[in-house]
Amino acid sequence: MLERNILIIDDNKRVKDIYIPAYLSKINELKIASEKWSKYQFNVEHCSSMHDALNYFSNSKNLVDVLVVDYEFNGETTFSNGIAFVKYIRENVNRYCQIVFYTMQGLRNIDVDEWSALVNSDVFKFVDKSTKEDILGEVIFEAATRRNPIVESFERFWCKYGAMLDTYKYTFDGQEVTFEEIINHIRMDDSLGRVFVEKLLQKSILINTKI
């Protein structure tokens, strides 16, 4: 399935019932207008705490393309704030998923060290939480459609030759996987996905090198 999965991490109780439907409404409006992205399913999930988000990530079946992370989590001690959580995700979970960071505190109230941590964590966009839902929906859509170009290349290949590719099993690094699973490993930047990309690039260089 062609999909993009968005995970919102925010302790605001209105996220699930009010904000997510508004975001999805805008996302679906934008995807319908695009021949390419109209083929994709956009899914939005919600975790109300950083602790729940870590549990979500611990399940290898939960694929995440975009993280939307709040700054403040009242009373939670898993991390000091959303910035520390973002830093942890980048260093330990996924180096390449898109991250949208927002806060009700106002972006100007984030200190220099925190800004530095966010920039070094390659955050896609910073958004004031008071921004209208349709604008944030646009930001999320933009983040979801600017992913790993290698993934998009494989997805296009899969769209064209999927019927044939799905009849095969691929043995890679000692594991038997489907072509769709290979794409998902790259999306999630896990160990198998990293090895596959490395070998793919090495082979591409060798094939195109004239000796």
Could you describe each region identified by the protein language model?
Residues D122, T131-V151:
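Receiver (REC) domain switch/output surface
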Residues S80, A84, R95-I135:
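Alpha4 helix (beta4-alpha4-beta5 surface) of REC/receiver domains from two-component response regulators
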Residues E29-S49, Y56, T78:
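Short hydrophobic/Thr-rich beta-strand motif most characteristic of the beta2 strand and flanking loop
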Residues N12-K16, M50-D52, Y71-T78, Q105-N109, ...:
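Short acidic, S/G/P-rich loop/turn micro-motifs used as interaction or catalytic elements
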